[in-house]
Amino acid sequence: MEERKEEGEAEIQEHGPEHWFSKWERQCLAEAEQDEQLPPELQEEAAAAAQPEHKQQKLWHLFQNSATAVAQLYKDRVCQQPGLSLWVPFQNAATAVTNLYKESVDTHQRSFDIGIQIGYQRRNKDVLAWVKKRRRTIRREDLISFLCGKVPPPRNSRAPPRLTVVSPNRATSTETSSSVETDLQPFREAIALHGLSGAMASISVRSSTPGSPTHVSSGSNASRRRNGLHDVDLNTFISEEMALHLDNGGTRKRTSAQCGDVITDSPTHKRNRMI
């Protein structure tokens, strides 16, 4: 067991991150590690920047000189003696203020340059350290998230797109439910026309055998019924039938009842019942 463990550790070390880089990459990494130090001209400034008390004391000393020179200039102007020129106090005050301004600007610029150099070096150091811990292939989103200081987005498995097959019955039911309101009116009209044709066929008088009792007894009633139907306006009759068949409540019951009454009164129905 111990031998296997040692072999596994050796294999991990053999295939570790340091073995992922080529010879040229290792050389570049070594040079980058050597360049982590600041240039010689900025090393002293960096050492001084590490001790800000020294810079603050120097600036404070220059400020005291400037304040003293300005106060002396004001004093000499108020208490001016005959034959004493104000040029010397003015020159001293101007020199002190100029030195204070120049030293402040230089200190700010040097601190700014040192900050930029240190920032570059720290950035390169962090990126190289991050690259050493990664695999040979680095994802673009990982690099961007590291540089921007954000969490990388979740990785979705890039599975091949699957085609969703919808059964014909399901598709038909979906289409039917979505277009019920569109196809409802023609469907109702077809039912109404079908019921109207059935009613007209029932109302029409069918011929029976000449000389039969049924034919003789129902001849006068049929003739009167035909005359009454001719008097009724066809458009009114169609409108009434359409209204009956398009009605939502009890439509089919009323239609069946009316058709049954008409068929009962028809001569053909009487003939069949008597037979």
UniProtKB/Swiss-Prot annotation:
Subcellular location: Nucleus; Cytoplasm
Chain spans, region Disordered: 32-51, 155-181, 204-227, 250-275
Extent of Low complexity compositional bias: 172-181
GO molecular function: ubiquitin protein ligase binding
Keywords: Cytoplasm, Nucleus, Phosphoprotein, Stress response, Ubl conjugation
Family the entry assigns: Belongs to the HAPSTR1 family.
Function according to Swiss-Prot or TrEMBL: Acts as a central player within a network of stress response pathways promoting cellular adaptability. The E3 ligase HUWE1 assists HAPSTR1 in controlling stress signaling and in turn, HUWE1 feeds back to promote the degradation of HAPSTR1. HAPSTR1 represents a central coordination mechanism for stress response programs. Functions as a negative regulator of TP53/P53 in the cellular response to telomere erosion and probably also DNA damage. May attenuate p53/TP53 activation through the E3 ubiquitin ligase HUWE1.
Summary of subunit composition and partner proteins: Homooligomer. Heterooligomer with HAPSTR2; the interaction is direct and stabilizes HAPSTR1. Interacts with HUWE1.
Protein name: HUWE1-associated protein modifying stress responses 1
Name of the gene this protein is made from: HAPSTR1
